[in-house]
């Protein structure tokens, strides 16, 4: 019988020193504060500032998380793209409720969105698809996301085969590749604070406006 090692990481901690978030710092619309924080994350040269963890659930209620990149946003929604045969896309076809989380650790900040996802039309998707690097377009064809493969060489071989196939002309949009628009109705902003007295504010949509509450850390 193999032995199982136990790892105690309770002593791994640090203090949060960057300052707090006060009500006077808030904006009327949550997307305005999100845009400000995102710009600050970009200006601070954070790695992948548009990376977000998205959570979905399967038909049995089992949650799954993965990292994707935010590509567009406006005052009501956020957009990401994916393979429509992926696990996340299948989950959203069954239950379109979704959570998106931006962890900006160096800035001691987090932002969480709750909402519902809907598929973008091919017309909406194709413009973004053709703005991607050509090799990324080909990779979208090569990978049947979440399917089982015997070795990485299978994937690389398929990529090279498709690269030759699409050597001349435009790479067409795969029918199995698309995007999702997440319309959000709840946004929480978290800012680290001294002595674990973190600042949390939650925006919740009420008709055409937003109600804001401070939450205990």
UniProtKB/Swiss-Prot annotation:
Description of how the protein assembles with itself and partners: Homodimer.
Residues involved in FMN binding: 66-71, 81-82, 87-88, 110, 145-146, 190, 200
Cystine pairs: none
Cofactor, how bound (note): Binds 1 FMN per subunit.
Cofactor: FMN
UniProt-listed InterPro entries: Pyridox_Oxase, Pyridox_Oxase_CS, Pyridox_Oxase_N, Pyridoxamine_oxidase_dimer_C, Split_barrel_FMN-bd
Keywords: Flavoprotein, FMN, Oxidoreductase, Pyridoxine biosynthesis
GO biological process: pyridoxine biosynthetic process
Functional note: Catalyzes the oxidation of either pyridoxine 5'-phosphate (PNP) or pyridoxamine 5'-phosphate (PMP) into pyridoxal 5'-phosphate (PLP).
Residue sites binding substrate per the record: 13-16, 71, 128, 132, 136, 196-198
Coiled-coil segments: none
Name of protein: Pyridoxine/pyridoxamine 5'-phosphate oxidase
EC identifiers of the protein: 1.4.3.5
Organism name: Photorhabdus laumondii subsp. laumondii (strain DSM 15139 / CIP 105565 / TT01) (Photorhabdus luminescens subsp. laumondii)
Domain of life the protein comes from: Bacteria
Membrane-spanning segments: none
Top-level taxonomy: Bacteria, Pseudomonadati, Pseudomonadota, Gammaproteobacteria, Enterobacterales
MF terms (GO), sorted A to Z: FMN binding; pyridoxamine phosphate oxidase activity
Similarity-based family: Belongs to the pyridoxamine 5'-phosphate oxidase family.
Enzyme class, UniProt record, top EC level: oxidoreductase
């Amino acid at each position: 019988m193999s032995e199982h090692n136990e790892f105690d990481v309770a002593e791994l901690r640090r203090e949060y020193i960057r300052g707090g978030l006060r009500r006077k710092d808030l904006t009327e619309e949550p997307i305005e504060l999100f845009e400000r924080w995102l710009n600050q994350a970009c200006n601070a040269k954070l790695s992948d500032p548009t990376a977000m963890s998205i959570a979905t659930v399967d038909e049995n209620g089992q949650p799954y998380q993965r990292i994707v990149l935010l590509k567009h946003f406006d005052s009501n929604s956020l957009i990401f793209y994916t393979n429509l045969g992926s696990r996340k896309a299948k989950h959203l076809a069954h239950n379109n409720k979704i959570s998106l989380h931006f962890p900006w650790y160096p800035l001691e900040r987090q932002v969480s969105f709750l909402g519902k996802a809907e598929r973008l039309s091919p017309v909406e998707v194709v413009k973004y698809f053709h703005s991607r690097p050509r090799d990324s377009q080909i990779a979208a064809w090569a990978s049947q996301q979440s399917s089982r493969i015997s070795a990485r060489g299978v994937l690389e071989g398929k990529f090279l085969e498709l690269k030759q196939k699409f050597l001349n002309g435009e790479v067409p949009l795969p029918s199995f590749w698309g995007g999702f628009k997440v319309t959000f109705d709840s946004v929480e902003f978290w800012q680290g604070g001294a002595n674990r007295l973190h600042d949390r504010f939650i925006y919740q949509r009420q008709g055409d406006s937003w109600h804001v509450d401070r939450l205990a850390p």
